Amino acid sequence: MIPKKIIIMAGGSGGHVFPGLTIARYLIEKGWLVNWIGTKNSIESRIIPTYGIKIHYISIKGLRNTSLKNLIISPIYILRAYYAVKKIIKTWSPDIVLGMGGYVSGPGGVASWNCNIPLLLHEQNKIAGITNKWLSRISTKNMQASPGVLRNAEVVGNPVCQSIIKVPNPINRFKNRTGLLRVLVIGGSQGSSILNRILPKVSFLLKEKIIFWHQTGNYELEKTKKKYNKLRLNQNLITSFIKNIASAYEWADLIICRSGALTVSEISIVGLGAIFIPYPHKDKQQHRNAEDLELIGAAKIIDQSNLNTKLIVNILNSLDRDKLFIMAKKAHSLGVRDAIFNIFNVINKISKKT
């Protein structure tokens, strides 16, 4: 039997890459051949090859907050990327092309449509990105994590890796847990400067109450470590990137983080109370992602413009492990744990028509 082939397009941020990687790994288990399209010097270039997946690099940049110069020359990059992906499609002949959103998906989405290859889209956020909005007009099938985001889209949830789904539920995690409150700090796959600046001060003021596991991102690891060391806070674990995020979720009583779609989905699946500091996008997509958890009392949302040391300290002082256990159970009630199966069913169904 000839194996099916798929090209997955995702890059720029963990929010696009990791859901795509979860889909890729599941498809490989099912006997599919997978190629990837991304950009050099982004997270996908460091992550995807380690899983034995062939990645093709295109030169393309996002247009959000870009300079006037880049905006003027962007059509040249888009055309080059389009022809590069078209050549890959002609050479490899995939059965399906899957776009996970973000600027990487744009040229490839148009190329797959032009080559009459079924184009599938997946939107992770509660507000669709520009690329997915445009491509949804020409795509074969649209998928979305939440209702009402893309036109004529099937609700499938956000795919997360099995290690996260297998994290023990809040009842088992919190049972007999004692000691300092365990706070996981994650500013997204690339870290967050504002969290790296504020959280060491918070740790100093609450060193008798909490312990941090802090993901800083690659660029600010040493600077953030120095802040903690200067305050003689040696009990905290400071790292640039947490590869085994499931173990971190299992360890934590609470998470302080951005509210990217994948992070919110993972927190719901695991069941973990959260303090969200949404990245201040103009469309407030991260704020929207977190609203359901705040509404049921599983999370608190702080706009970045209001964030300061005193506010975080006051919130943490108002919490104890019993309250965090209640927040965790509420979060757990919203978890969508069958997204990968839903997505595979859609992909498999479309592939049988080719």
Swiss-Prot record:
Enzyme class: transferase
Origin superkingdom: Bacteria
Catalytic function, reaction form: di-trans,octa-cis-undecaprenyl diphospho-N-acetyl-alpha-D-muramoyl-L-alanyl-D-glutamyl-meso-2,6-diaminopimeloyl-D-alanyl-D-alanine + UDP-N-acetyl-alpha-D-glucosamine = di-trans,octa-cis-undecaprenyl diphospho-[N-acetyl-alpha-D-glucosaminyl-(1->4)]-N-acetyl-alpha-D-muramoyl-L-alanyl-D-glutamyl-meso-2,6-diaminopimeloyl-D-alanyl-D-alanine + UDP + H(+)
Keywords recorded for this protein, A-Z: Cell cycle, Cell division, Cell inner membrane, Cell membrane, Cell shape, Cell wall biogenesis/degradation, Glycosyltransferase, Membrane, Peptidoglycan synthesis, Transferase
MF (Gene Ontology): UDP-N-acetyl-D-glucosamine:N-acetylmuramoyl-L-alanyl-D-glutamyl-meso-2,6-diaminopimelyl-D-alanyl-D-alanine-diphosphoundecaprenol 4-beta-N-acetylglucosaminlytransferase activity; undecaprenyldiphospho-muramoylpentapeptide beta-N-acetylglucosaminyltransferase activity
Location of this chain's protein in the cell: Cell inner membrane
Keyword Cell cycle listed: yes
Family classification: Belongs to the glycosyltransferase 28 family. MurG subfamily.
Full protein name: UDP-N-acetylglucosamine--N-acetylmuramyl-(pentapeptide) pyrophosphoryl-undecaprenol N-acetylglucosamine transferase
Lineage of producing organism: Bacteria, Pseudomonadati, Pseudomonadota, Gammaproteobacteria, Enterobacterales
